[in-house]
Amino acid sequence: MPGNAGTEQTTTVIIGTGLSGLAVAAELCRRGVDSIVVDGLDILGASHPANTASLQRCDAADSDTLRERNEILRHLRNYAASHDVDIRNTTRAVQLTMVDGLALGGGLATPARPQWEVRTPTGILVADNIVLTRCAHSQLRRMINDFGIAVGRNLTAAMRAIGIYLVGVGELITPSPKEVLRQAKTVGQAISAKVNPDSGPYPATGSFAALPC
């Protein structure tokens, strides 16, 4: 790939630099889990572009909720800046590929615990976990089918089984800001438990812990 800057390894790649992406990045940072946040995903699965324009915003007509959302965003951006969270606002993912971790030379992954290659215009990000934000359920189901995995009724469980987590994703409308924070906390706990299975929960300290849930 022209201009490829090489391959980077991280625990989690978060796709989306909005409220959902920043919330889960801050939660992971608070728990000592590294992540890289990219702006979005231009290709979803093998051949389906990510299209979130059809999703309605639940707060579009609610000025109080919009103010709350903006205040939380401001807080999250300040947290990210002060804690050196790796946010790449001008970088978009152009391909998402599930790979056998053993093929990458790490020797840690198993067929039941694949790794992910996230291609960007400047290189490849290799991660154990992917967090998706603002994608329609129908697109997510197509993506899982493209990977040859039976979805069944529980989309979230099917995706978590292969290391993909959802934050801020709704069927018809986007969740409220407080619901996004709740989802981010749940996903942060799940990923942290995979990374540090023998450690106890991190204490809810720091300014991010004071955000409403």
PLM regions and their residue ranges:
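Beta1/beta-strand and adjacent pyrophosphate-binding region of the FAD-binding site
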Residues: 2-20
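C-terminal, flexible cofactor-proximal segment of oxidoreductases
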Residues: 143, 147-155, 160-213
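Short glycine-/acidic-enriched loop or helix-start segments at secondary-structure transitions
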Residues: 24, 47, 99, 141-144, ...
